[in-house]
Amino acid sequence: MTRVRDLSEEQILERIVPLLPRGSATLLGPGDDAAVLAAPDGRFVVSTDVLVEDRHFRTRWSTGYDVGRRAAAQNLADIAAMGARPTGLVTSLVVPGDTELDWVTGFARGLADGCASTGAGAVGGDLSGGPCLVVSITVHGDLEGRSPVLRSGARPGDVVAHAGVRGWSAAGLALLETGLVRVPLSAAPLEVTDGVLLEDEWERLVAAYLRPDPPLAAGVLAGQAGATAMLDMSDGLLRDAGRIARASGVLIDLDAGAFAKDREALRSAARAVAAATGLGDPGWGPGNADIDGLVDRWIWAGGEDHGLLATFPAGTGLPEGWTAVGQVHAVEEAQDGGEAAPAVTIGGEALDVGPGWDHFRS
């Protein structure tokens, strides 16, 4: 069994660089002091994100392949949320010396598979030793002549729409924490057809947590269709919708009946998790309220699905992959005569299902 400490940095790079995608916009890839990417638009969209062992992933659940897929997903989704097309990533990887080389090569394969649908290249980065696994990625994107879609553009009358799955990652995490699903999974990609789970439904939820599969093409389609605001939902629907509401100075009201297909996909897992954790009777009777509440929490507050939330002008035909889930309203005066704060409601009512993910409180 070969470990990282058994090889030099150059020998490790010789194993992983050939596994990485070059990318259609790459003019100069790994091997020099810096990479060179084409920028036909004249502008770069740039974002960065970090994953830390035992904070964002756990090696008892996640293989190197899983972490590579997750790292690609959460970075590429940020570019898609601006209405841009991802073009290239630079990756910094910190690995303890006793890490198996197979973990590192698996990471490279996962990163490559995560980029495959976008044409983005893994064009360089850095490799270092350290006390725990850390991944930091900076990703670039191309607007292709369009304006970036900001969080601050939502206007009263706009339609709120969603692309991707809701609550699956949170349910997958719960299944792992309760021991109801064993890992590791195979390296097969997550397959989703019209919101319906394929193969083993619990395993698909766990795969959504370990290897998020964001609707990257939907971001470009939204930008082309004239979306007024958009973001990547990594921290929970209510928390992230609130970011659009505050940036735009509006009220967002979400449809209480939205995400029916996701609810159906989650209910079996919720019943099992409720039984395993003592939330309530998993059969008929009062326990069903606990199950519904758990599904609500996953839908409204569950993070790391990396779906997209956007607003579109009323009357706009929603692009492929998008579903209407709410409405944008003007912020009305508060009862005391002052100005009410931008907010998010569900069916016109405030709902407390937890705060969503916060890096310093969760």
Specify the residue positions occupied by each region the protein language model found.
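Extreme N-terminal cap/leader segments of soluble proteins
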Residues: 1-63, 82, 91, 112
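Residue-level signal for inorganic ion chemistry
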Residues: 36, 75, 83, 122, ...
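Polyanion-binding loop/helix "lid" in catalytic or ligand-binding cores
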Residues: 192-242, 292, 301-307
